[in-house]
Amino acid sequence: PESAAIYVFLGSMQEILSDYIDLFGRPKLPPAYAFGVWISANRWNCEEDVEEQLACLKKHRFPASVLVLEAWSDEAAFYIWNGAQYEAKPGRARCEDYDFTASKYWQDPKGMIDKLHEEGIRLVLWQIPVWKKQGEEEEPSSQLALDAEYAVQNRLCVMKQDGTPYEIPEGNWFAGSLIPDFTKEETRRFWFEKRQYLLEMGVDGFKTDGGEFIYQEDILFGDGTTGREGKNQYCQDYLNAYTDFIGEEHVLFSRAGYAGAHRTPIHWAGDHQSTNEEFGSILTAGLSAAMSGMSFWSFDIGGFAGALPDPDLYLRSTQMACFSPIMQWHSEPEGGQFKELMPGITGNNERSPWNMAAVYGKPELLDELRYWHNLRM
């Protein structure tokens, strides 16, 4: 491409990394709590689930420093707690805008966050950079409709060169959705004024999923970049915007990235199957990331998708995670993330240490796993 810039690095591995960091900037050091044990499962979608996990940690004497919630929001605007009652309005979102008394999911999210903090556990919430196109089976979100209308009217979403809004093409994740143009200061202001109240409630970070949403070349970003030029840069603009928003004592947990991703940690190798083959690939990917300047990477202990890992794979994966930059276990939705292609198990498919021991009838597995969790802490 005529607009391409090619950099050639020579010397030892140490010299190459040093020159790369000089060019793109030094890595950002995550806060200390990020180096403990992260716990996560897609099925956790209410305060009762969080209470259950706190009880399990105490019962089985396992440490944790971060709890991740994926299914926490309305699954529409992605900044409103599921079940909250409110009136759609323009402008900044505030905690007092939402009534949680009738929610069957989150009756007191602020109190829950405070309790987690009292237990020494930080909270990370899932995010996705879209103004979602809702399905016919979904309850329409008045707030999402208001936000998307404002984004289009003020050209805060990514636009095509013909002046129409870009929509994620059919056949892709979140097809038909609009995506924010993070090259624009006004977009960043509008996007994050909706989420500032979450930090004020005590939320400690965001699991910034997705970002690989540029599938066409006939796009024109606010900074003049075309879709061809910005295809890879978009996900990094997304992470740069969130990094600037959260400040120093908060964390990101991201999947996509581009040149400069080492300055917006942490990244994880997401959605791999619970097989020995993919476990080997995780080691290769982690070493490759580290040699590319990405110091803080992670993966899902024992895998994320498909049938549960066997006890041997889960134990070896836990051992590797103990000595990896970030230690985290996570689980796909019940029935499988990719159930049309690769069904998961029915019922509780959680990759927690206690569920693994219960499923396989091996209570002694807990003692082995506890050793590596405590060694990490």
What does each model-identified segment do?
Residues 1-377:
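Catalytic-domain carbohydrate-binding cleft regions of carbohydrate-active enzymes
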